[in-house]
Amino acid sequence: MYEPSRQISSFYIAGFQYWDGALVLSELKVGERLRLVPEFDNPHDSSAMAIYRGKTKMGFVPGSENELLALMFFYGHSDGFELRVLQVSPDKNPWEQVRVGLYVTDAR
């Protein structure tokens, strides 16, 4: 069966409470695509992968999930992945308000 993409991971956005995600929380829709941006010069984690909605930085891919993804981006394979909103829970603690899914896309 053909699938245009396959989910390989899901997680809450790390550091959501420290960035500007709250500014766009009410606008987020399940299924909406978000943008992954590597931060290879990040002083805390050279594998850091920031998550953006438009120009709004929402937080990061958790450190436990970012190393292989950052490596793929470093070697030019960024087109093979997409990040989508899976759950928006405004009433939860900030670190559990937005859960996203990481998908590998079919390039065949």
Positions of PLM-derived features:
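Conserved active-site motif detector
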Residues: 1-108
